[in-house]
Swiss-Prot record:
It comes from Bacillus cereus (strain AH820). This is Peptidase T. Keywords: Aminopeptidase, Cytoplasm, Hydrolase, Metal-binding, Metalloprotease, Protease, Zinc. The gene is pepT. Pfam families: M20_dimer, Peptidase_M20. One of its GO terms (cellular component) is cytosol. GO terms for molecular function: metallopeptidase activity; tripeptide aminopeptidase activity; zinc ion binding. It is found in: Cytoplasm.
Length: 410
């Protein structure tokens, strides 16, 4: 199993599947189409049936039931795309067997080192096989680790028919990282009662609370003139963006928050004197606080429009997803089964809110309750990202055990 995990994962991460916030196609990048087509062929090779890829790049497949019991149809999902925060082109995965727990030089030439001082969890992976980047790209374990685990689990179940299970549906979705993952997901065609996203982090992660999330695009329009004669004429759009950001509470940013605390996050800022564009994400677990944060954004914009003119600041703000807890609680047994599956494998479940989003956040509101399960990755979205193959193996075992328990309890 370990060899298959390594082979699939290292091959998958070399395919550039970063999504693109500025694209209006579905999926937003051609790499996701390329990857989806590859997975269609590999799902067929593994032995799954009803393998499809629609015009929007959504891949679905079925592992038929091998029991006569009336078992609820369950699904396992992962996403095709990788994050936009750091380059995902020309990923060169580095395999470190029997990791010694000490610092790893990712790139000697650029002096990029993964250290326990910066990442204190690193020594806990001593003895594991871990896969890192070469320091110049992200790894893409988010979510190609989860995708790999689903592929390996389905392959294992097909080759071990003594493990009884109901019908299992698999789906791989595009554009999760930019909040569009389930936008064109056909819940009815998927046909599952419940599902799990394999899109978590370290060992034991079991998540069914997520942020409420919104995105805000702000365009600041200035007036450019020669700086030598600019008095009372120039309006600097970049300074307008700085002024806007200055109105937000400094301590309510990702770098100062944890647990159930929400935040405003300036994701990007580009521009010049004439025009600047800023993109923020707004996050909070509590719906009232979430709405209050959006109101804060709107009020700052209104104040600046009153001061500088209506066209000085233009706001586009959209909700992206909501806290899935509301939709998971009525079917709490799906969390309990995952919890029991982990305990039976001597994995201590770590239940905590997702300080992020998964496809499950939106799918739960579309009628498909979908908690999230660990994959073994750490430090997502950057050059220090890595994954433990040993933990990936545990994740595969959890998928198998969940399928077995649904059949057993039917």
């Amino acid at each position: 199993m370990k060899e298959e995990l390594i082979e699939r994962f290292t091959r998958y991460v070399k395919i550039d599947t970063q999504s693109n916030e500025d694209s209006h196609t579905v999926p937003t990048t051609p790499g996701q189409i390329e990857f989806g087509k590859l997975l269609v062929e590999e799902l067929k090779e593994v032995g799954l049936t009803e393998v499809t890829m629609d015009d929007n790049g959504y891949v679905m497949a079925t592992l038929p039931a091998n029991t006569d019991k009336d078992v609820p149809v369950i699904g396992f999902l992962a996403h095709l795309d990788t994050a936009t925060d750091f380059t995902g082109k020309n990923v060169k995965p580095q395999i470190h067997e029997n990791f010694d727990g000490n610092a790893i030089t990712l790139n000697e030439e650029l002096n990029i080192v993964l250290t326990p001082e910066q990442f204190p969890e690193l020594p806990s992976y001593k003895g594991h096989t871990i896969i890192t980047t070469d320091g110049t790209t992200l790894l893409g374990a988010d979510d190609k680790a989860g995708l790999t685990e689903i592929m390996v689990a389905m392959n294992y179940l097909i080759h071990n028919p003594q493990i009884k299970h109901g019908k299992i549906r698999v789906a791989f979705t595009p554009d999760e990282e930019i909040g569009r993952g389930p936008a064109h997901f056909d819940v009815e065609a998927f046909g599952a009662s419940f599902a799990y996203t394999m899109d978590g982090g370290p060992l034991g992660g079991l998540e069914y609370e997520s942020f409420n999330a919104a995105g805000a695009k702000l365009t600041f329009n200035g007036t450019n003139t020669h700086p030598g004669t600019a008095k009372n004429k120039m309006r600097n759009a970049t300074k307008l963006a700085m002024e806007f950001n200055g109105h937000l509470p400094v301590e309510e940013a990702p770098e100062y928050t944890e647990g159930y605390e929400g935040f405003y996050h300036l994701l990007s800022l580009n521009g010049d004197v004439e025009q600047s564009k800023a993109y923020y994400i707004i996050r909070d677990f509590d719906r009232k606080n979430f709405e209050a944060r959006k109101n804060t954004i709107e009020n700052i914009v209104k104040q600046m429009q009153e001061k500088y003119g209506q066209n000085a600041v233009v706001l586009e703000m959209n909700d992206q997803y909501y806290n899935m807890l509301e939709k998971i609680e009525p079917v709490r047994e799906i969390v309990d089964i995952a919890y029991e599956a982990m305990k039976s494998l001597n994995i201590e479940p770590n239940i905590h809110p997702i300080r992020g989003g998964t496809d499950g956040s939106q799918l739960s509101y579309m009628g498909l309750p979908t908690p999230n399960i660990f994959t073994g990755g750490e430090n997502y979205h950057g050059k220090f990202e890595y994954v433990s193959v040993d933990v990936m193996e545990k994740a595969v075992q959890v998928i198998i055990e969940i399928a077995r328990r649904f059949e057993e309890q039917a």
